[in-house]
């Protein structure tokens, strides 16, 4: 039995609004990532120096071989240069933001996968979420995800997705959500454990293949394991719940780490002042701070700022999208819903809010 919920068909005015908003947000994201974060603080000379000398400013060697395929390895070097300074453990704030943003992006990857599977069960259709996730790997979430949400808004009109037709596919989605939640740690582990330079940089490089691995998880679940070997989901929306919970854990880890750092500084600035300072350094780009020399922290600080812009743009993208997913359910007044989504973003994280919004919309729209 299906609960009848009024469908939200977008008017021309709404189409224009979403096109302008998410198109503009994508443009702002691209500008923030590639024209601000990576175009100052002597970032370009620092990258050029690493490429020419094969060493970072602190003397760390640059590994250039990851797959033994020269043409492919050349494409992976920029990611290694970008992330290496964030994973050395030099600054705990880097680790906290890495966990937060990558758990958020993994939740989005799951939302893309479920959306694709609800529309088509063909194996070839999995190229679509793979494309979007690879696109994100190379151009940044602040640019790519608003474009994806714009496309989803235009094509689905915020209507509930159709249920995935087969039990095998539904069960495989649940397994993909559970295993996929750990995918970011295949490259984040050097931030937690002592590792050699080569191991750390190879982990960074090979994580570029995570989108392909994530899609392969779904294929393996559907084609190889079989429905009888996979736990049956209790709800069509269970994968969203898993992804949202994983994103929440990542966000709570970042907030808990920030609170711990603030406690160490509280004797100098007071508890509230210390917490405010740590959260600003964790999430807000320090646009006024410029670097005038090529020191070892130039690239790491630029990469951290890059991820900070990712977080801010994703918040601006996810809150209105989640609102329009939930609005037809009439769960609360518009004002109360907006306040709830903002508070949810603060305390659960943007990735969790979007995944949970999808879950609530689908769970209430489709009776299992």
Swiss-Prot record:
Kindly state which keywords UniProt assigns to this record, in alphabetical order. Answer: Isomerase, Membrane, Transmembrane, Transmembrane helix
* E.C. numbers: 5.4.99.-
Belongs to which family?
A: Belongs to the membrane-bound ascI terpene cyclase family.
Question: Under the GO molecular function aspect, what terms does this record hold?
Answer: isomerase activity
What is this protein's record name? Terpene cyclase alnG
Q: What is its main location?
A: membrane
- What are the transmembrane regions? 5-25, 79-99, 138-158, 173-193, 210-230, 241-261, 311-331, 335-355
| Localization terms from the record | Membrane
Q: In which pathway does it act?
A: Polyketide biosynthesis
User: What induces this protein's gene, according to its Swiss-Prot or TrEMBL record?
Assistant: Expression is controlled by the asperlin biosynthesis cluster-specific transcription factor alnR.
Has keyword Cytoplasm?
A: no
Which source organism does the UniProt entry give? Emericella nidulans (strain FGSC A4 / ATCC 38163 / CBS 112.46 / NRRL 194 / M139)
* Role, per record: Part of the gene cluster that mediates the biosynthesis of asperlin, a polyketide showing anti-inflammatory, antitumor and antibiotic activities. The first step of the asperlin biosynthesis is the production of the intermediate 2,4,6-octatrienoic acid by the highly redusing polyketide synthase alnA with cleavage of the PKS product by the esterase alnB. 2,4,6-octatrienoic acid is further converted to asperlin via several steps involving the remaining enzymes from the cluster.
Effect of a null allele: Strongly diminishes the production of asperlin.
Stated membrane topology is: Multi-pass membrane protein
List the record's Gene Ontology CC terms alphabetically: membrane
